[in-house]
Every structure is written in C-alpha cells, then in structure tokens.
Amino acid sequence: AMFTAIQKDATMKAARMAGFKQCELLQEPIAACMAYGLSSEEKDGKWLVFDFGGGTFDAALVKVEDGILTVFDTEGDNYLGGKNLDEAVVNKILMPSLKEDYNLSSYETTEWKKRALMDALKGPAEEMRIALSFADSADYSTYDRNLNLGQDDNGEEIDLEITITKDQLIGAIGEQYQKAVNICKNLLRRNGLNGNDLSSLILVGGPTYSPIIREMLKRPGNKYASKYILRPCCDCCSPWSCSLCFYY
C-alpha cells in the first residue's frame, strides 16, 4: 500500500523476469477486501483496512460501490510492525530481567555483544507475545528450549527464566499499537470521517490476532465500536486474492 514508484517498477520488472507477460499490481488493501469477499454489490460502503505486518503498518480507506473496490486514501509507517513489538518486549522486559541476575556491563558498552543478545531474545519475545494473546500470563525458560544466550562478564551462562503477565506486555507494546491507532485517526480526520462512517474495520496481519489491539480499537476515544471489528483476515490474503485474479 505504501510502495514508492521505484518499488512498484522493481516489482513489475521482477514479474517480467519471472516470465509473466501480462500482469498488474494489486494493492494490498484491495487484496484484503477481496479476501473478505467485499467485491460484492451487497457490501457497498467505506471500509478501513488495518494492516499490521511484520515490519510495516498500513492503513487504507477503501470504497466499495457496485462491487468496484477503490482505495481513496492511505497512510502508514514503514518502520512499524511486529518486529517493533518484539524489540519493545526485549528492551522493556527481558533485558531488565537479565540485568538483575547477571553482570552484563560489557553488553552496555560493546555494541556487537548487545546486538547479538538482543537478537537472540527476539525469538522468546515473539513466543511470549503470542502466548499472551490467549492467556493472562506466560512462562519462558531457555532450559526447555536449548537456547544459548552466551555468557555474562563473570563467565556464567546466561539463562532466561521469566513469567510475564498480560499487563506487563500491554505496558511494553501498547505505545507501538497506539502509533498505529493514531495513524488511523489521522487518516479518518483528513477525510472528514469517524468510526461511525465505516461499514467495518478489516484487520490484517499476524499482530492483529492479539486481543490487545482489538481492545484498544474498541475504546470510545478511538471512535471504534465493537460492531466495527472484524476477525483478523488470513495472513495469506494477498496471494489468495492474486490467485482469484488468475482464476478469473
């Protein structure tokens, strides 16, 4: 949805190199709407696509009229996605916990050591973030997963054993989700709309499976009532929609 002209040209060039003689770029918001079956005259209206991916966030306003889907405005952040949620969990929860148990002074002054440890912790961060989508607390232990985090400054093996609550997770990642919500607010405000003007809100991307973001979108201050929240669309909505195009 936020591709530049250069990125679009590169995508078309790659398609031609792959042997596709006739092809057309399908915008991600259109793909999401097609995956929901919105290319139907029975579903005319205005829809907000909330696409929170692994590395980027896109919001798009889509108009459906007589079965024709049109993206009439978009906004997003190319540096906001699931990886930012994991980094927030690492920085605000996991690293402080390890610093309480181990001597990590050199990790503060040596960039490559700090980066290596933080990268190793992103897997546990994602695992716990997903687990807390379905539970109020989650446990993690490197002993159970044979994960090597290296040694601290005293030569002691670094092991992570921690329990995280949903409230802790919200405190760590809520700011990132709020950035996405604010982007949607700006998009609606720019077009003179609010949540009451939408037929519904389409959630796309793995992070939207979390109840945390759905609860934030339902807050009165965000102008989204619960009736506007749809279940998250399948993660493969773009290729699925492309397959429909090939079929037709």
Label every model-predicted segment.
Residues A1-Y248:
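Oxyanion-binding/catalytic loops of NTP- or PPi-dependent enzymes
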